[in-house]
Amino acid sequence: MRDCVLVRVYGERTELLVDRENEVRNFQLLRAHGCAPRLYCTFQNGLCYEYMQGVALGPEHIREPQLFRLIALEMAKIHTIHTNGNLPKPTLWHKMHRYFTLVKDEINPSLSADVPKVEVLEQELAWLKEHLSQLESPVVFCHNDLLCKNIIYDSTKGHVRFIDYEYAGYNYQAFDIGNHFNEFAGVNEVDYCRYPAREIQLQWLRYYLEAQKGAAATPREVERLYAQVNKFALASHFFWALWALIQNQYSTISFDFLRYAVIRFNQYFKVKPQVLALEMPK
């Protein structure tokens, strides 16, 4: 398999969701920092890149301490990537508003009764922006879509690498981590009982902070990031629920996107009271 290349062809109408020029720039940036495979060429509806040795992980793997430590270290490495220029702005709100507008203008008349009304979604989006913007989570370079199959583990080298940079870009640190924690539940058979328990999260966050700082993390730093991450995990549910509604309308993939959207919205409203009760350490 060492002489293999991968060719990825873009899905139907995915330009509604993904900036393909930005994806290529992200690919090249990550490659320059040793975090991505070689990109050989791009074409109008896809790209060709180096095959990365290893196995794609599943929900049963990413909760193993030896593996989640490697994932935390790799995320910390990516989060330290900087580009020259002005201070970056988070992509979260721009993308979320864009997705919401698509749902509101093009999909709303055909929405299932199981999906919250557009007026409710608009109120929740405004609340998320107001509440989360006050948490002072640093804006860093993020993967933004760290589900299990986007993590490749090479047991011979003892490291993990992340793949698929469609949604990568500058964003809130806590969003990237919270989004990954949500992915412990899986995609095809979603089970939020697998969401990492507090002790697992604290250990994961300790690994991450110590890799980022190059020094021991204080209990306050870990607790602060824990609160930020679980609050931003709410935004992750909302983001991918909107995304799934758009995919349900346009995608030709055999996947029940509407069901997935309903699951993510349901989990959003279920955990919102618990998240609201989390206090930021003084």
Task: Give each language-model segment a name.
Residues 21, 239-242, 259:
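A broad detector of short, well-ordered amphipathic alpha-helices
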Residues 80-89, 135-138, 214-220, 250-252, ...:
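Surface-exposed helix-capping loop/turn segments at secondary-structure junctions
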Residues 1-121, 127, 131-138, 156-157:
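ATP-binding pocket architecture of kinase catalytic cores
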Residues 247, 251-282:
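Regulatory N- and C-terminal appendages and interdomain linkers associated
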Residues 1-7, 125-181, 186-188:
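Active-site acidic catalytic loop and adjacent metal/ATP-binding pocket
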Residues 75, 79-86, 107, 132, ...:
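A general structural signal marking secondary-structure boundaries and capping sites
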Residues 174-216, 234-252, 267:
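Active-site activation/catalytic loop segments of kinase-like enzymes and analogous catalytic loops
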Residues 217-233:
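All-alpha amphipathic helical-bundle segments outside canonical DNA-binding/catalytic cores
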